[in-house]
């Protein structure tokens, strides 16, 4: 893709959404940072643009045309043929834009993405941005990993039927003869739904309706390093025609915490593993499947069976590989840097030396709103992965000040309400978590 820095933030008014005045080439997905050798480019903070073209065949007329971004760090404004079609804040989860009425069929269309990597105390992860005497901006993270930025995951152009499957969720129960899968399907139309479960090419269970139960005899269970996946097929029918078909791979398993032990399918499992990062040399945090595969092989070699997605939700492909490899995941929302002592140190003693909790500031309501949005998006995306066994809601936050309970409680309640499988909710504590 074409790429250009926009340090004066003049691109929107100057018409850069239609054509960049000058540009470099930039691979996607990738962070831009480590692709440069000069310090100013590597540590650039502010607006920057991507530009490319895509073709929409005439045969797609009558379908909904949707652009889906795996992640853009940290803020994105998306333009198609110069028209703004989406805005998104949050650098670690997907978002989409419906462009059905914007695209031109049977010809090329211009896609432009304005990205911003500045940090603030109302965003996840937290930080601040300073402006130097020469006008340059510099990011001051409250977190201890590099502030990589760019289009980090794949971008998809999709043609979708007008009536389609929007979402589904599952819950599992083991029985004496196998397993039962309670499901819920949401669609955007009135036509009937069928749900089938396949083991290879053999159909092993079926049901109908947007809610129901699949009864699986002699079910093969998903387990640590012994993953077994079934194909779940959801269809919408209009008479004899299939309006939409959605396929996903699921694993049958149960989990609970009892007497201080984690039980998977009723048997205790000791969690051994890591808090990881997606970072790698050259491409930064951009998705790179060979590196992902190598990381999984290293974890197996060392005897691990679990990892925490420190400190943000990872690319969907990593969860799919964990499903296939039989790894357990503690899925973490990017709530990191919520420590006032860190904020004071890195942001030039905010609060003028007064002892102040991180969650008792004027920025707290906006932060909590963004935190809830990120948590909702993470659970919506990852709730059907058999590998995901817990939600991590914060990493090393200040947890002893007056506003802590008021901030934490709605997050834990929200996670409980959103997750049909009622996974454990957790957060990581730092021993120095005082103001």
Which residues are covered by each model-predicted region?
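Short acidic/polar inter-strand loop motif in beta-rich domains
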Residues: 116-123, 238-243, 266
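Surface beta-strand/loop "capping" patches
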Residues: 158-189
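Accessory beta-strand-rich segments of carbohydrate-active enzymes
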Residues: 3-6, 45-164, 189-190, 202, ...
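Core domains of carbohydrate- and sulfate-ester-processing enzymes
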Residues: 2-47, 113-161, 260, 337-346, ...
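Active-site-adjacent substrate/metal-binding segments within catalytic domains
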Residues: 32-56, 60-68, 73-89, 154, ...
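Short acidic loop-to-helix transition motifs that present clustered carboxylates
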Residues: 93-95, 255, 313-316, 419, ...
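Extracellular glycoside hydrolase catalytic/binding regions
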Residues: 398, 406-435
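Extended acidic/polar, glycine-enriched regions
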Residues: 104-108, 184-258
């Amino acid at each position: 893709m074409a790429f250009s820095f926009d340090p004066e933030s003049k691109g929107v008014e100057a018409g850069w959404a239609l054509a960049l005045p000058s540009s470099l080439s930039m691979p996607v997905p990738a962070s831009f940072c480590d692709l440069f050798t000069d310090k100013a480019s590597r540590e650039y903070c502010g607006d920057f643009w991507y530009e490319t073209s895509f073709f929409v065949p005439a045969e797609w007329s009558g379908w909904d045309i949707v652009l889906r971004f795996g992640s853009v760090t940290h803020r994105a404004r998306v333009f198609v043929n110069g028209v703004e079609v989406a805005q998104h804040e949050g650098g670690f989860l997907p978002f989409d834009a419906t462009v059905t009425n914007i695209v031109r069929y049977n010809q090329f269309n211009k896609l432009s993405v304005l990205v911003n990597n500045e940090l603030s105390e109302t965003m996840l992860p937290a930080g601040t941005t300073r402006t130097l005497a020469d006008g340059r901006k510099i990011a001051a993270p409250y977190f201890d990993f590099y502030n990589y930025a760019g289009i980090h995951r794949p971008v998809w152009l999709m043609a979708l039927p007008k009536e389609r499957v929007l979402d589904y969720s599952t819950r599992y129960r083991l029985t004496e003869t196998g397993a039962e899968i309670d499901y819920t399907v949401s669609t955007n139309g009135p036509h009937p739904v069928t749900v089938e479960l396949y083991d290879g090419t053999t159909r092993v269970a079926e049901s109908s309706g947007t809610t129901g139960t699949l009864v699986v005899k002699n079910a093969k269970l998903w387990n640590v390093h012994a993953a077994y996946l079934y194909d779940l097929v959801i269809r919408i029918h209009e008479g004899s025609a299939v309006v939409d078909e959605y396929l996903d791979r699921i694993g049958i398993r149960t989990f609970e915490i009892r007497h201080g032990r984690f039980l998977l399918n009723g048997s205790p499992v000791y969690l051994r593993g890591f808090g990881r990062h997606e970072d790698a040399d050259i491409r930064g945090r951009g998705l790179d499947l060979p590196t992902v595969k190598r990381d999984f092989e290293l974890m197996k070699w060392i005897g691990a069976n679990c990892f925490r997605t420190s400190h943000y939700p990872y690319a969907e492909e990593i969860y799919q590989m964990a499903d296939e490899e039989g790894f357990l995941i503690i899925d973490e929302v990017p709530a990191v840097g919520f420590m006032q002592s860190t904020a004071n140190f890195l942001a030039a003693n905010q609060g003028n030396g007064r002892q102040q909790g991180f969650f008792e500031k004027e920025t707290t309501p906006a932060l909590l709103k963004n935190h809830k949005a990120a948590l909702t998006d993470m659970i919506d995306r990852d709730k059907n992965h058999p590998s995901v066994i817990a939600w991590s809601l914060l990493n090393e936050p200040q947890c002893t000040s007056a506003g802590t309970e008021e901030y934490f409680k709605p997050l834990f309640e929200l996670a409980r309400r959103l997750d049909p499988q009622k996974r454990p909710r957790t957060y990581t504590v730092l021993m120095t978590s005082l103001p």
